């Protein structure tokens, strides 16, 4: 595995808006997976060594993104940073890593807060459009344990009870409001666990059923349920048979299925 570290994607925030690349050794045509870390929009960072399995075991390149968080940031700064990072990374790969097929094999995903951010980029087109992209410029999205309603720390910013279920412009599910053309829906892989945060499995099911209600092409959408795991437990859990992280196995299977079509 090769690395390119500490690349600034927003010069106005050089201490925070950084991305690390984890690349396969072989410079052959490969997918690129942009990963947004978790931490409740107030913690966490781009240093996610469990993602090493993707380039080392599956030949999938990874760009691990750090973004502004509370208390310095406010809604929707972190969504805007995420969109800026995707556009920057796509252009950076075109110019510096031309063997990565970002035209046909570009994936975006995240876990927990990062799953919320990936959902916002997937369903709320205005964020990527600001940077000259649209959600379908991304081949597929991996939403791992994200909150499809207003994120609990955005509720806290508003002075509200963080347990409230609210749906407005800060909720990914808000934007599921029409029946799309199948070609306008990117592939999706949605992950959640049995012992997730209270109400997270139910909200995940609501997201899935709302897409079905609006006649999304459900054959393009996968759901993965992890019995026995807590919130994002599949990130650090490894398969005892081969020692590969469960999240990476799931992500790689999804990416390989989509790119083989």
Q: Can you name each region flagged by the protein language model?
A:
Residues 91-155:
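Primarily recognizes the serine-hydrolase "nucleophile elbow" in alpha/beta-hydrolase
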Residues 45, 63-104, 239-243:
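Catalytic nucleophile-loop/oxyanion-hole region of alpha/beta-hydrolase
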Residues 43-52, 76, 202-203:
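The serine-hydrolase catalytic nucleophile loop
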Residues 205-208, 213-261:
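C-terminal catalytic histidine-bearing segment of alpha/beta-hydrolase fold enzymes
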Residues 1-27:
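N-terminal cap/lid segment of alpha/beta-hydrolase-fold proteins
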Residues 46-64:
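Short amphipathic alpha-helix adjacent to the substrate-entry channel of hydrolases
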Residues 29-39:
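Short beta-strand element of the alpha/beta-hydrolase
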Residues 133-135, 140, 146-154, 164-206:
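The feature captures the conserved acid-bearing segment of alpha/beta-hydrolase catalytic domains
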């Amino acid at each position: 595995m090769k690395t390119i570290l500490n690349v600034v994607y927003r010069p106005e925030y050089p201490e925070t808006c950084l991305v690390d690349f984890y690349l396969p050794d072989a410079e052959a045509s490969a997918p690129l997976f942009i990963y947004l870390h978790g931490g409740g929009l107030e913690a966490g960072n781009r240093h996610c060594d469990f993602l090493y399995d993707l380039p080392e075991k599956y030949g999938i390149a990874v760009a691990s993104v750090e973004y502004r968080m509370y208390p310095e940031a406010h809604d929707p700064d972190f969504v805007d940073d995420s969109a800026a990072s995707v556009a920057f990374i796509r252009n950076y790969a075109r110019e510096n890593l031309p063997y990565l097929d970002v035209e046909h094999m570009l994936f975006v995903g995240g876990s927990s807060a990062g799953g919320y951010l990936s959902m916002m980029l997937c369903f709320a087109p205005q964020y990527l459009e600001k940077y000259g992209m649209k959600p379908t410029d991304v081949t597929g999205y991996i939403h791992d344990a994200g909150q499809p309603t207003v994120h609990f720390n955005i509720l806290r910013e508003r002075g509200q009870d963080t347990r409230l279920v609210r749906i407005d412009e800060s909720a990914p599910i808000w934007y599921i409001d029409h029946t799309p053309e199948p070609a306008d829906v990117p592939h999706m892989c949605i992950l959640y666990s049995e012992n997730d945060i209270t109400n997270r499995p139910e909200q995940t099911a609501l997201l899935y059923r709302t897409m079905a209600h609006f006649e999304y092409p459900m054959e393009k959408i996968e759901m993965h349920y992890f019995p026995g795991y807590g919130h994002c437990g599949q990130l650090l859990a490894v398969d005892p048979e081969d020692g590969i992280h469960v999240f990476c196995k799931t992500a790689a299977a999804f990416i390989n299925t989509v790119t083989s079509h």
